Regions:
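A short, glycine/small-residue-rich beta-strand->loop->alpha-helix junction that serves as a flexible
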Residues: 5-18
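Conserved nucleotide-sugar phosphate-binding/catalytic loop shared by glycosyltransferases and other
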Residues: 7-8, 30-81
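Conserved nucleotide-sugar donor-binding subdomain of glycosyltransferases
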Residues: 67-104
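Donor nucleotide-activated moiety binding/catalytic core segment of transferases
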Residues: 81-91, 217-253
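Active-site proximal beta-strand in glycosyltransferases
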Residues: 110-127
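Catalytic donor nucleotide-activated moiety binding site of glycosyltransferases and closely related
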Residues: 196-229
Length: 253
């Protein structure tokens, strides 16, 4: 029996969790309980594959115009609720605890002296693995947000370390095989940027069509830009059609 915690701040964690849920479902002797945090329960989507999943507030980050805002992040934290959730999470029924950078499960395991397996991209960011830049806040978050005993890091390259490649959900491809990519159609996924600014930039590019996904967007056509709310099926279909991708996050994209 496994407790599997998933950080819900970014959709890459959810994509990876869906792939893992499909893989683990092939072993009927294994029972998996899923716990998600990092966004409101109502903002999670396409959760049918996780059964009676649990929700906690957890820890998340406030962003604006593509950057983490430390002061706004501190203001939105609920440390009392986090500590209560961490103390009340009973791990005795579970044989294994897994955390994809999910803090409630990770800290509950540390408090109860249980080994927690960390599976995710953040666990690949060890000394010796290149990073674009280092800052004190980012290093602190990586160390303290969801500490684990056993690390299984995922990255595009191993850089001489025991790292695994990204987990891709091959079963989620559209039925009927891959679509023919349109040579001048691009998928745009910039969920932490100002969407109106991005749309204005894209509409100024002639001869191209853009399918833009992001939180808070509605399905509408705005010139050469088709906006969409985030959804698994529509996103994968647009990805199949696109010949180019514009993104600054989404590790499993």
């Amino acid at each position: 029996k496994i407790l599997y915690g998933v950080q819900g701040t970014g959709n890459g964690h959810l994509t990876r969790a869906r792939a893992m849920a499909r893989a683990l479902a092939r072993y009927p002797q294994v029972q998996v309980d899923w716990l998600f945090s990092g966004r409101t329960r109502e903002d999670f989507f396409d959760m049918e594959g996780f059964g009676a999943w649990q929700w906690r507030r957890g820890l998340s980050f406030a962003t604006r115009a593509g950057r983490v805002r430390p002061l706004a992040t501190l203001r939105q934290l609920a440390p009392g609720e986090f500590l209560r959730d961490m103390r009340e999470l009973d791990l005795d029924p579970y044989d294994r605890v897994v955390s994809d950078f999910e803090p409630v499960t990770a800290w509950a395991a540390r408090r109860q002296r249980r080994d927690c397996i960390g599976l995710g991209h953040q666990y690949a960011l060890v000394p010796g693995v290149p990073r674009s830049r280092r800052n004190l806040l980012g290093s602190l978050v990586l160390r303290a947000c969801a500490p684990v005993g056993t690390r299984i890091g995922l990255h595009w390259h191993h850089f001489g370390h025991p790292l695994l490649p990204p987990i891709v959900d091959a079963d989620a491809r559209p039925a009927g095989g891959p679509a023919r990519a349109s040579p001048r159609e691009a998928l745009v996924y910039l969920p932490f940027e100002d969407p109106e600014r991005v749309i204005a930039l894209l509409r100024a590019i002639p001869g191209w069509r853009f399918a833009m996904f992001g939180p808070g967007l509605i399905a509408e056509q705005r010139g050469n830009v088709a906006t969409h709310p985030v959804g698994r099926a529509t996103f994968v279909a647009a990805l199949e059609r696109a010949s180019h991708i514009v993104c600054n996050c989404g590790f499993e994209l």
